[in-house]
């Protein structure tokens, strides 16, 4: 399980870890973005809709819990670490300062920096609010994680080596 805010690198590391360990890969962010695209909404608009309609998050979480219960998977999700903390073998939090993450998001999505900043701030606020309201989860409590890495401090390779070493030490 690799968790972190938008643009922290969780998808990059989760995909690679899944491949190297011969496991499946599952991303709640990809599902959220595809639902937004299907509805013709921006991520900020989709986040606002999810604030009003808990069924969106609950459906994504139901699917995630179902996938996790089968095992053999690396999950990339902001919230699932808290939902699965008692079941997951390895919980990793990747993080980076907001300005680093916004630059990454703007580059990844091909959008202007200002738009990436506005959408990221709104999305994070919405997630924090929804997670607290729906689940009583405070995403600032990071004590559940086995490993926390600031991805702005290390190269992609060095960060990945830390994550992989942690996985090996946990018997994965």
From Swiss-Prot:
Gene3D superfamilies from the UniProt entry: P-loop containing nucleotide triphosphate hydrolases
Keyword Transferase applies: yes
InterPro entries, sorted: Cyt_kin_arch, Cytidylate_kinase_dom, P-loop_NTPase
Main location (coarse class): cytoplasm
Recorded catalytic activity of this chain's protein: CMP + ATP = CDP + ADP; dCMP + ATP = dCDP + ADP
Keyword terms, alphabetized: ATP-binding, Cytoplasm, Kinase, Nucleotide-binding, Transferase
Coiled coil: none
Any GO CC annotation of this UniProt entry: cytoplasm
GO molecular function: ATP binding; CMP kinase activity; dCMP kinase activity
Record-level GO BP terms: pyrimidine nucleotide metabolic process
Enzyme class: transferase
Binding-site positions, ATP: 4-12
Pfam families assigned: AAA_17
Compartment list: Cytoplasm
Catalytic activity, EC: 2.7.4.25
Homology family: Belongs to the cytidylate kinase family. Type 2 subfamily.
Protein's name in the database: Cytidylate kinase
